[in-house]
C-alpha cells in the first residue's frame, strides 16, 4: 500500500451534518431543508425536470403594522376599507320601493319650484292691461326637459317555496311617465300664453278701421225670431183637436150576425145594444121583401124588431133563421109597446128606470140591474136617438150622473125618472 492510496487530501471527504431543530417554520421557498448533505468543494448543478408543473404564486409579503397609535386597526381591515368604495362605484345597488317614492317626491318638488319660478319671471298680463313698457319684455323659453330612462331591475331566479316579490319595474315606469307628463303640460300652457301674446300684439299694432257706438246703435234684426209687437205676423194655426176616447166602445162592441135565409147564409153587423129593426130593414132591402113580412127566430124562439143581441143573449157562434111570411104579425105593435099607461103603472118584476126627454112623447123604459153602470142607459138612449153617446147628459134630482156610477150608489129602488139632455 502506497502513500498515494492513503492520501487523505486526494479524495473527497464526506461530512455528516449536525441534526438540529429548525428555528423557522417549514417554507417551500427556503432551500436550506432541501439540501441535507453539504459538500465543501463539490458543487452539483441541479437538473431541470422535463415535467411542467403548475407555477405557484409567491407568498404575499406581510407589511409591518403601523407604529402610530391612531391607526390601531389591523392591516387586513385597512385594505378592506380601501377597496370598498371601488366596489360601490362599479356595482349599483337597487333602491327599495320606499326610497324610490321619496326620490320621486323630491324630483316633483324640485320641478314644481322650477315651474313657479319660471311663471313668476314670465308673468304676462291680460291684453286689456298691457302697456308700451311691456312690449320689450322677452318671454323666457320653457325649462329643458331632462330625459328619463327606464332602468329595469335584474330579477333573481325563482326558487321553490318562496313567495313572489313585487318587481320595481312598475314603480319606476309610473314615476318616469309622471315626470314626462308634467313638463309637457307646462310647455302647452306656455305655448298658449305665447299665442295669446302674439295675437294681442297684432291687434294692438293694426290700424283702426271703424268704431261702433253700442249705446246709440239700433239693434239689428235677427232672422228666425218672432217680433211680438209686429202686426204682420199671421195667427198661429190652432193645434188639431184630439178626439176624446170613447169609453162606450168596450160596452157596445160590433158583432157579426149569421142568418140563414132560404138555405143561404147571410152575414150582418149589429152592435150589442142595437135593435133588430135595423137588421129587418137590411134583410128586406137585400131580398126584395116587405119589412113587415119577415120572421126571424133563434132556435125556435122568435126575435122581434125591438130586441137586441144583448137582450136575447146572441153570441158569435149562434145562427139565426129567417122566413118570408104574410101574416103581418109585426103590425100588432100595441101588444109589444112597453110605455102604454098600464105598463107604466104596473109594478115591474125587475129593476128598471125611465128616461124622459124632449125627443120623445113617452118615457123610455130601460130594464137593468142595480149593480150595472149607467153606461147602459147612455148607450140605449144613443141607439134610440141614433147619435153618439158622448153627446148625452143624464140628470137625477138635478145631479149629473157619471157613466161609471151605479143605481145602488144613488139609492134607487126602481121606476125612477132620469132627465136626458143633449150637448149643444
UniProtKB/Swiss-Prot annotation:
Q: Which SUPFAM superfamilies does the entry mention?
A: Ubiquitin-like
Low complexity bias (residue ranges): 167-177
| Phosphoserine modifications at | 32, 34, 96
Q: Where in the cell is it found?
A: Nucleus; Nucleus, Nucleoplasm
Q: List the InterPro entries.
A: NFATC2-Int_DNA_Repair, Rad60/SUMO-like_dom, Ubiquitin-like_domsf
- The primary location reported for this protein is nucleus
Q: Where is the composition biased (Basic and acidic residues)?
A: 77-93, 104-123
According to the record's subunit comment, the protein's assembly and interactions are:
Forms a complex with dgrn; likely required for localization to the nuclear periphery. Interacts with the SMC5-SMC6 complex members SMC5 and SMC6/jnj following ionizing radiation (IR) to induce DNA damage. Interaction between the SMC5-SMC6 complex and the dgrn-Rad60 complex, may stabilize the association of heterochromatic DSBs with the nuclear periphery.
User: So what does this one do?
Assistant: Required for repair of DNA double strand breaks which occur during replication or are induced by ionizing radiation (IR). Functions with dgrn and downstream of the SMC5-SMC6 complex to regulate strand break repair. Likely functions by stabilizing the association of heterochromatic double strand breaks (DSBs) with the nuclear periphery as part of the homologous recombination (HR) repair process.
Recorded protein name is DNA repair protein Rad60
Which organism is this entry from?
A: Drosophila melanogaster (Fruit fly)
User: Lineage of this protein's species?
Assistant: Eukaryota, Metazoa, Ecdysozoa, Arthropoda, Hexapoda
